[in-house]
Regions:
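Conserved, well-ordered core segments of regulatory domains
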Residues: 1-6, 11, 60, 80-91, ...
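RNase H-like nuclease fold core
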Residues: 1-60, 65, 69, 73-77, ...
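Generic structural signal for hydrophobic core residues of well-folded globular domains
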Residues: 20, 91, 95, 178, ...
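Short, charged, low-complexity patches
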Residues: 37-41, 96, 100, 188
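Acidic/histidine-rich catalytic cores and adjacent linkers
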Residues: 76, 109-226
Length: 226
């Protein structure tokens, strides 16, 4: 988001959205920083903990380096899922244009399986097919394999919502769209106020809505918490 400090700069806005076992979702916290780094994410996680968020069952994130370690320090019992959409984008950026469509279509099959065992088979077939052409890509994918299929450990009714960060991406798009007419924010306080208003509007909008699938498995999800 554009912000004027001493010069015109683009600020990183860190946003955490959560879904309760009953399916109610809300913006839990946010902060503004000059750039994205793990230290700020660590502070945000600690802020959420200090404000009363005692337990997290599943944490979904893009590929920020160190995020899993930071999460383990604040919420050691939380499980970590890497956003498969971000992983796919990263893969497509590293392969030849003529291979992108095939690779993208095959990678999408990973999150469309009936169970984790089938997804593992699809993933390993993906390795075997593309390893010769893109050894570095497959090697990197194998390094993060433990974080790719965690969402299969949860009820099938909610898996479509927990394999990617699309929920946050949608909120980010709202912020970008509404911020665009402003060109830039004159102060950090004005930007903070703007983000706060968008967060409250989001929370008001979804206060009594149950996210798709969660109502069907509420009892199961509640059993994961102390």
């Amino acid at each position: 988001v554009p912000l004027r400090r001493e010069t015109f700069e683009r600020e990183a806005v860190y946003i955490a959205i959560g879904i309760k076992p009953n399916g109610h979702k809300e913006v839990i916290d946010y902060c503004i920083a000059p750039n994205e780094n793990i230290e700020v994410w660590t502070e945000l996680l600690q802020s959420m903990k200090s404000r009363g968020l005692e337990q997290v069952e599943l944490f979904l994130s893009d590929g920020v380096v160190g995020m899993k370690t930071a999460l383990a320090k604040t919420y050691p019992q939380a499980h970590f899922q890497r956003c498969l959409v971000h992983v796919m984008r990263n893969i497509c950026a590293k392969v030849r244009v003529e291979d992108r469509e095939a690779i993208m279509n095959e990678f999408k099959q990973i999150h469309q399986q009936a169970n984790k065992a089938a997804a593992v088979d699809v993933l390993h077939d993906f390795y075997a097919k593309w390893n010769k052409s893109y050894n570095h890509v497959i090697r990197n994918l194998k390094d993060i394999e433990p974080d790719l299929l965690v969402f299969y450990n949860y009820p099938k009714q909610i898996r479509a919502s927990i394999y990617s960060t699309n929920m946050i991406e949608s909120f980010n798009n709202v912020i970008k769209r509404k911020a665009k007419p402003k060109a830039e924010f004159p102060t950090e306080q004005s930007l903070d106020t703007f983000i706060g208003i968008q967060a409250m509007s989001y929370n008001d909008r979804y206060f009594n809505r149950i996210h798709k699938g969660f109502g069907q498995v509420q009892d199961t999800l509640e059993s994961y918490f102390d």
